[in-house]
Amino acid sequence: MGKLVIISGPSGSGKTTICKLLEKDPLVKKSISMTTRLPRHSEKNGKAYHFVSTNDFEEMIQKGELAEHAEYCGSYYGTPMNALREALEKEIIYLLEIEVQGALQIMEKFPEAISIFLLPPDKKT
């Protein structure tokens, strides 16, 4: 049985750095979030994010197909429920690098998940 590990914290707290280090372990796989924002020129669908339309995202919300979701800067971000269920069936550690609101939603649906909250070393960071 797999494990869900949530890494959350404010911008600059080191979430991405920690996740990149953990991903070096072959038993660790990072979740790919879904978003309605437009891809940046260097981004490919399915690598950093799964890019979907606002209509598709809102339909997934209505159908309960997202484990967590939030709106940030006018775009939706979320994690598909089926991705988490599939990860739990495997012998892997599934990392979710998400903001606090999303972490709380995941913890409600998957209380066995491990949640790690990172804080930057000081207010300047």
Positions of predicted regions on the chain:
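Hydrophobic anchor at the beta1->P-loop junction of P-loop NTPases
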Residues: 7
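P-loop (Walker A) phosphate-binding loop of NTP-binding proteins
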Residues: 10
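ATP-binding Walker
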Residues: 13
